[in-house]
Amino acid sequence: MISRVMIAGGTGRLGTLVVNGLAARGVDVRVMTRDPKRAAHLAGERIEVVLGDVRDPVSTMKSAVGVQAVVSAVHGFAGPGGVSPATVDRDGNTHLIKAAQEAGAELVLMSIVGAAPDSPFELFRMKYAAETSVAASTVSATVVRSTAFVELWIDLLVNTAGRSNRPLVFGRGQNPINFVSVHDVAALVERVTLDQTTRGQTLEIGGPENLTFDELARMVIALRGGSDGPRHVPRAALQAMGPTIGRLLPTLGRQAQAALAMDQSDMTFSAGVNDIRARFPDLPCTSPEETLRNFHAANGRADRV
């Protein structure tokens, strides 16, 4: 029985939901964060915040002592100096795997649908490297792969819309992409953390729709009372960013390269025979439309989605 869990990445969009969900179930949750101020929104008698960084094997090992499960909800796609997919998603997860092994704990690793050694996305390659490290270890683990969090991209579209109410789309915006609600993913991660029968398995979760960025942007525009189409950053501009601005600002360079890949790679999702919601029928299946309505309700007015 899992009664004490350590979560790395517990202050983020996904991690916060998992922390609160597990604590509500009566699980003692230890949140490892490199900045305790970022955990100020996490409060409760079952929630403990400790200082640690997945890039540092010593603090990671210390944070895992005494727990029965370690959950990795980290990602290094964007962040301050030294944060990258290589240092966080590959090396950091390797440290978490070793910490779980040393503590005699089980592991839940958050990964990405499409993770592969030859992926055009650096993040996907590093997630695959972490999965490989799990497979080579003796840790009893569950890997959860998800598609793109729709809340993340809605945030980006809303924040770039400005007074014109025309969100900024990187590239053509015509490539179908599967979007999933982070709430759906959190519900699965919470479940498998406690369900030890899922150990040794890789589970995939996606959303109910494949949408282009143009389609998602137009949904945001419509909810905010507009009718025009989104603005676009041409592919040529994105291609130029990598060898120029990207050298000075690596995060921006990664974002440009990711945008190019998302504009042409197959990012659709079909559950098929491994439909996670057939296995767990009570898992939520939130549509992008419902997520947008929730944003509207949370902010009070459509112009503050």
Features from the language model and the residues they span:
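N-terminal Rossmann NAD(P)H-binding glycine-rich loop of SDR-like oxidoreductase domains
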Residues: 2-27
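Non-catalytic, hydrophobic alpha-helical segments
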Residues: 14, 70, 185, 189, ...
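NAD(P)H-binding glycine-rich loop region in Rossmannoid oxidoreductase-like domains
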Residues: 31-103, 114-116
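Glycine-/Pro-rich loop/turn segments that contact NAD(P) or position catalytic residues
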Residues: 76-163
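Glycine/proline-rich active-site loop of Rossmann-fold NAD(P)-dependent oxidoreductases
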Residues: 152-160, 192-203, 226-228, 302
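Glycine-rich Rossmann NAD(P)(H)-binding loop
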Residues: 170-175, 203-210, 222-225, 232-235, ...
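Substrate-positioning beta->alpha
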Residues: 170-193, 201
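A hydrophobic C-terminal alpha-helical subdomain
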Residues: 235-305
